[in-house]
Amino acid sequence: MENQNYPGVFVRVKAVITDSVILLIFMLGIVALFDRFENVPDIARIAAFVFIFLLYDPLFTSIFGGTIGHFLLGIRVKPANNPHKNILFPLAVFRYIIKALLGWLSLITVGGNKTGKAIHDMAVQSIVVFKNQTETL
């Protein structure tokens, strides 16, 4: 993996912005759906909130190798030691928590290392790669 070209900050920021739009669409869809019903149980509202704000990133990252924003931009999140697999769900949750807590600060290390790892990638030993590069490894 040493000869690869890794996604830089700009590509990763575009993925975050894309995911923000996707989450907004999810929220609007859920609100529209709930508006069709007279009495929506609080548990349904809580479950929708948890999925949208807490589980979207870790679930998609652990199951599909990235969020919808990652897919649209052709990047994937993989374990640094095995780019053919997806990171485990508990690691994806921890990665997301660090990313959410640090916000944009987490990306300051992307340009400073040869594999383009953000702080949240370093914490869980993940790496962000271009999709076509995972197919050739």
Predicted feature descriptions by range:
Residues 1-137:
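Membrane-interfacial and juxtamembrane segments of integral membrane proteins
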